[in-house]
Amino acid sequence: MVKSKLPYVCGIDAAIDVVGGKWKVLILWALDHGTTRRFADLRRELPGVSEKVLIQQLRELAADEVVHREVFHEVPPHVEYSLTEFGDSLNEALRPLGAWGRRHIKTIEANRRPAEFDIATG
Amino acid sequence: MVKSKLPYVCGIDAAIDVVGGKWKVLILWALDHGTTRRFADLRRELPGVSEKVLIQQLRELAADEVVHREVFHEVPPHVEYSLTEFGDSLNEALRPLGAWGRRHIKTIEANRRPAEFDIATG
DNA sequence: GACCCCACTTACTTCTTGGTAAGTACCCCA
DNA sequence: TGGGGTACTTACCAAGAAGTAAGTGGGGTC
């Protein structure tokens, strides 16, 4: 995702900057409805993400105050990730866009791979 | 902007793929409310965009059936860009996200430049 | 004839993002 | 003592998105 230059010229610009990483909306989705997840849980829920990138995006979301990171100093210690209220409001704002994408996902995919076939290649 | 791998795992993934270029939401905004614009108009309305990137993003939006490109074979010939109905529905779906970004733009900007000052540097 | 506008196209470079793979440090269990 | 789990960090590399700059080919204007 391409970062917009600051200052943002409009709200969408800013919002997409927050949400534009390859795995960020998926992380937001995984933490929806007040869900709490550990680092290793998220790894398992996002097949294909590397540890490096997952941490990177979690840190960025935390820096944006969208995700809350809490360390539990128990034995053994662990870390829990959840949405902040701010993150929750972001997820709400994303819902119409998600619905649009879901509604048109076939069209979008088709336009994105004009060289491929939808039928099985023999 | 980072492209998601196909097939998309959720609608947001797909939508952000359509809208994720650096200038795309700005183009969508410029063409909002049935507005029609020429290439040169858009260049002027998006200060900082290069011709190469503007055309590239217009072509991608057209390939996604979000933007309509019409050539007028008059003398002199020219080209007009406008939103399709599909693009219009996308803009509608983007509005809540835009409102969220606008509401929190100060917070987002502040979190995005922790090393800079908001007061003028002397 | 020189210059501007329109709508691009092309070649080259840089910068950012993400991916790969390995290492760290600590704990528990058998 | 070897293996597994937790939560990272680090270094290196590749792909792609965007930026720069120049060229194209038409027309119209002074």
Model-identified regions with their sequence ranges:
Chain A
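C-terminal regulatory/oligomerization modules of transcriptional regulators
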Residues: M1-P7, A63, H68, S82-G122
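Basic amphipathic alpha-helical segments that dock to polyanions
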Residues: L54, L58-L61
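N-terminal helix-turn-helix DNA-binding core of bacterial DNA-binding proteins
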Residues: V2, L6-V53, H73, E80, ...
